[in-house]
């Protein structure tokens, strides 16, 4: 025989197992598996053991012989341990994976039949294994489905995939035809049942589909956000088994327009991070009119007032306004500073943090124009200039560049139509904006608010007596939806290449009536989503008198006219005199009648911003804003012979029976167009702070006064005076 010598024992070992009765005839039946000895390529994991089926059988051959070469010896598969059997089958599977079948071939390789003979339990059922063998197309459930005779031909058409993966995983990469019966495999059957179950319960929804919207009716004027409100009834078209997906869907729920004129707007979950990004447009003016006051930033800490006047004095006579200077006036400190005091000393003296800026005030606006001609400006600048000043050091003179921000008076107002100024703005669509940057003009603020919330009718910026902005203003929207959206946001971050600012947005209550009784002027505003209404003092006490400790609604006390605050004070606090009028007379419920009941201006008062430590609740004036109050010694009370009907048409005149009035030259609110010639300080005031009782020379006790900015000053006992509320005279005794 031409076979190798080492194959004879294996051939002999197979005879007794197959045909022991043919020993006499001399015939030897070779097991079919021993015919796979050539051209077998392993494409799965490369085994360190045999490279062919013959070598594999030779490795597992039992070497014990009886000494006679002609005695057949069993391969001994049934004598192997369970680990050896699993290892043998795994290696056999790896060696035979390269035997592929062509279309139309259904015969199995001998190695596949041998593997199925020894391990029938690796299939789900015997019938499933038989049906798999009869199919004409290969599948992942029939690993040994091709004969090894055509291995070289099948691999000649395509290159082998050299991947260090298991044999079964390599079969998954082949292109397969879908199986007609999904129950052939346990995994496929389970997947099919799960798919059918989901198909019956759910309807497919596009990924970008917006959730359904629900119409809800709520009280008039209320506004609710998804983060603060309880979860509303919401019908979803899909059911998700993942809690994370449910939470994501809840965050995406958007409530719709509600009952009344209040429109619900979608708010980001990160409400405080609402922001606007953009650039300020370049300014181009024709014969502009500048304010006499300019901002000077980047000032050295050790610069003195003399050095500033020396640098800016060449353009005209000027004065220096230090940050926090108005705090010393209101706190009773001396206005006399040490000579040659620098910026750090001024900040320390006024009790405020050290700042790097000052204000320069010129006598003539033409000096500001001359200064700007000597300044440098960036191409396309948005209103900032740069000027070099001389800072005197101990042994040398240093040249420093500071920033100059002037103000054009026409930038304080911007309206689409001039007729709005004649008709007047709508207070219920007006919001207050605070903490504005000095480079934000009315037109810039108009563009920002319109981009973020909606159409804007008019923007007004508040200025001081020098017509320089004080960092606050009012924005009137065209629609109520934009107004409520702005109120709900509360804060807007403005990001530009020049600055970053966090702008405050609050309701503006000037000339607004109570939304509960519709009779009294509104004094506060409740931002709680369950209320979101304007209230007078009485209605607030009724609606919020039983607030629990857990649910406390904090009112937004917006500075309005000081006289309105006194009306609310008289109607709310019972300890005042019974003669104090708390309501307008019959038939006089208009604004004219309301102002006719105003507190007489003979009350000694300081009309202006509150102290830095007790500023307005929402920052209606900055702590570093400077105001120099002016004392008017002449009284402004009307004569006793004047009647109520004459007061609305007369002008206030001085007489000798009143107290002084301290009027701040920096009103927070610009003059309002009133029906009666009320002095401007009444319409512009933001607080009333009265001196002590000894100021009047009267022993009358002081009483708490509920000011509009929640600052508790004092006011003497009022007495009736010809139908008016007037202060006690200087010689008044109880």
From Swiss-Prot:
CDD domains: Bbox1, RRM1_CPEB1, RRM2_CPEB1. Residues 259-275 have a biased composition (Polar residues). The keyword Transcription regulation does not apply. GO terms for cellular component: cytoplasm; neuron projection; nucleus; synapse. It holds the Pfam family CEBP_ZZ. GO terms for molecular function: mRNA 3'-UTR binding; mRNA regulatory element binding translation repressor activity; ribosome binding; translation factor activity, RNA binding. This is Cytoplasmic polyadenylation element-binding protein 3. It comes from Caenorhabditis japonica.
């Amino acid at each position: 025989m031409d076979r190798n010598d080492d194959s004879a024992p294996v051939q002999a070992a197979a005879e007794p197992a197959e045909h022991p009765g043919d020993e006499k005839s001399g015939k030897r039946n070779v097991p079919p598996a021993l015919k796979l000895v050539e051209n077998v390529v392993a494409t799965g994991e490369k085994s360190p053991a045999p490279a062919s089926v013959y070598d594999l059988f030779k490795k597992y051959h039992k070497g014990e012989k009886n000494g006679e070469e002609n005695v057949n010896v069993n391969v001994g598969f049934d004598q192997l341990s369970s680990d050896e059997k699993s290892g043998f089958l795994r290696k056999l599977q790896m060696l035979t994976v390269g035997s592929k079948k062509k279309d139309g071939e259904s015969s199995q390789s001998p190695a596949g039949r041998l593997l199925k003979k020894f391990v029938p339990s690796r299939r789900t059922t015997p019938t499933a294994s038989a049906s798999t063998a009869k199919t004409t197309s290969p599948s992942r459930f029939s690993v040994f489905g091709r004969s090894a005779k055509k291995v070289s031909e099948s691999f000649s058409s395509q290159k082998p995939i050299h991947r260090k993966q298991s044999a079964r995983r390599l079969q998954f990469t082949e292109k397969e035809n879908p199986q007609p019966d999904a129950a052939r495999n346990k995994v496929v059957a389970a997947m099919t049942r799960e798919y059918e179950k989901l198909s019956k319960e759910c309807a497919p929804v596009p990924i970008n589909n917006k959730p359904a919207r629900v119409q809800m009716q709520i009280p008039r004027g209320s506004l609710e956000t998804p983060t603060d409100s309880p979860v509303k009834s919401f019908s979803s078209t899909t059911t998700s088994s993942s809690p994370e997906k449910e939470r994501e869907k809840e965050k995406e729920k958007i409530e719709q327009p509600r009952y009344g004129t209040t429109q619900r707007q979608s708010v980001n979950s990160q409400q405080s991070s609402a922001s606007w990004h953009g650039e300020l447009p370049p300014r181009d003016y024709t014969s502009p009119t500048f304010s006499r006051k300019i901002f000077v930033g980047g000032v050295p800490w050790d610069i003195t007032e003399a050095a500033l006047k020396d640098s800016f004095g060449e353009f005209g006579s000027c004065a220096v306004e230090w940050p926090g200077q108005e705090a010393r006036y209101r706190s009773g400190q001396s206005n006399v500073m040490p000579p040659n005091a620098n910026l750090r000393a001024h900040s320390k003296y006024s009790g405020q943090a050290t700042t790097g800026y000052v204000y320069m005030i010129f006598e003539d606006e033409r000096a500001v124009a001359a200064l700007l001609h000597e300044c440098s400006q960036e191409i396309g600048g948005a209103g900032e200039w740069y000027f070099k000043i001389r800072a005197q050091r101990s042994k040398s003179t240093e040249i420093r560049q500071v920033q100059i921000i002037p103000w054009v008076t026409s930038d304080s107002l911007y309206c689409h139509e001039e007729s709005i100024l004649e008709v007047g703005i709508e207070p219920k669509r007006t919001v207050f904006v605070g903490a504005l940057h000095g480079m934000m003009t009315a037109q810039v603020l108009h563009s920002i608010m319109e981009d973020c919330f909606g159409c804007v009718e008019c923007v007004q910026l508040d200025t001081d007596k020098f017509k320089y902005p004080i960092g606050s203003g009012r924005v009137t929207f065209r629609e109520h939806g934009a107004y409520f959206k702005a109120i709900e946001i509360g804060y807007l971050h403005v990001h530009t290449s020049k600055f970053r600012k966090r702008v405050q947005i609050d309701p503006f209550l000037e000339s607004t009536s109570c939304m509960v009784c519709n009779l009294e002027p509104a004094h506060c505003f409740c931002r709680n989503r369950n209320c979101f209404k304007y209230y007078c003092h009485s209605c607030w006490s009724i609606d919020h008198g039983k607030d629990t400790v857990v649910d406390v609604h904090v009112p937004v006390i917006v500075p309005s006219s000081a006289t309105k605050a006194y009306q609310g004070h008289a109607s709310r606090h019972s300890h005042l005199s019974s003669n104090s009028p708390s309501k307008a007379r019959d038939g006089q419920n208009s604004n004219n009648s309301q102002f006719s009941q105003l507190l007489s201006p003979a009350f000694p008062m300081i009309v202006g911003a509150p102290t830095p430590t007790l500023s307005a609740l929402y920052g209606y004036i900055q702590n570093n804003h400077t105001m120099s109050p002016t004392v008017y010694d002449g009284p402004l009370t009307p004569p006793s012979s004047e009647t109520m009907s004459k007061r609305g048409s007369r002008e206030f005149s001085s007489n000798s029976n009143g107290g002084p009035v301290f009027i701040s030259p920096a009103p927070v609110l610009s003059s309002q167009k009133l029906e009666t010639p009320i002095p401007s300080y009444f319409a512009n005031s933001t607080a009333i702070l009265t001196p002590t009782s000894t100021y009047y020379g009267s022993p009358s006790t002081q009483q708490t006064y509920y000011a509009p900015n929640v600052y508790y000053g004092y006011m003497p006992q009022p007495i009736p005076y010809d139908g008016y509320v007037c202060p006690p005279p200087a010689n008044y005794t109880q």
